[in-house]
Amino acid sequence: MNDFIFHNPDKVYFGRNQMKNLPGELLNYGRRVLLVYGGGSIKRNGLYDKVVTAVRGNGMELFELSGVEPNPRHTTANKGAAICKKEKIDVILAVGGGSTIDCAKGIAAAALTDDGDVWPLVSNGVWVTEALPVVAVLTNAATGSEMDAWCVISNMDTNEKIGLGGDALIPKAAFENPEFSFTLPAYQTACGAFDIFNHVLDNYYLAGEATFDMVLEMQEAVMRAVVKWTPVALKEPENYEARANLMWASSMALNSILDAGTVHACPCHGMEHELSAYYDITHGHGLAILTPRWLTYILNDETAPAICRLGETVFGLEKSGNVVDGAKAAIEAVSSFAFDTLGLEPSLSKLGIDETHFKAMAEHVCGESGIIGLRSLNVDDVVNIYKMCL
């Protein structure tokens, strides 16, 4: 295992009765609050009114930025940064899922730059060391942005979707009430669940470097929780235990605890970011389409043991006398989870995607060094995987 430093100062308020602590958390940073949210679901489910009452009822001034996109645009983040500069915002309150929190982080970083433009930070790979404080109220278990140091911002003019990171982007506090996810559409629940699953699988578990058993088994536990509880949440949207397990799995998957001593790889995430950048598809759905095809493509005698273990420890498959056969069964289990259990469309072509941009997408994600992971990939490999998904 590798040396590591674990640092996560995010304070999590988890459960049904934690929103009473929201005003106090915000007041730690000031009285001028920018509320950031998406398409209006928080107004329909009543959460918006609760938040506004809590903020204004405790003497704070509230400003708003609504309409954050599922793949948040740099232009939207820049609008928020302009509000922060004009209104001298003290703290940003993100209420929503990962896209909303990501956008809030982009705003937080851009607001402290001279020009208020997030894209130079993103495109130049700047590690953010100063940003406005962000407090998150989570409504969708998916990206893990509520407890990590990253955000992903899209530039639809250049067909780029790129991560921006920095310790300053870790939320100061996160409020996680599983009840806030009760009204999520089944499709969003399914896509979010696969995003969580793939965060672990893609980032660490099959990164290509062994870790120590405790961390490996923690990774497996998070993936097992997703496999176990997502069908329950889909069948019973107001099942608190199911929603709670998924919400905490979301936070655990990317808060750095599961990458202790490992390397980061993210082959599927890199490939999917290209799909989202060009075609604006839902991130978790793109991952669901890519993951079983990627596993099939990289399967050989060397990669088979790790993939076989996935089937046995996460999906409960019987031990196989032949690891290649066991790995094939594991891949089938992943595929069945994505397309049968979650009900996600397995074909890119059915989403209106053809191979027109595959070469450009592959060249961008591979860069000069290719994609690392359980098996390294070059441009031709990535194009082939995309074609397998049509």
How should these model regions be labeled?
Residues F197-L201, R243-L254, T291, V334, ...:
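Short alpha-helical scaffolding segments that buttress acidic/His motifs in well-ordered protein cores
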Residues I307, V314-L390:
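C-terminal charged capping/lid subdomain of soluble metabolic enzymes
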Residues D10, L112-T211, P305-R309:
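A glycine/threonine-rich phosphate-anchoring loop and its flanking beta-alpha core
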Residues I89-K105, T139-S145, Y278-I281:
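Glycine/serine-rich anion-binding loops at beta->alpha junctions
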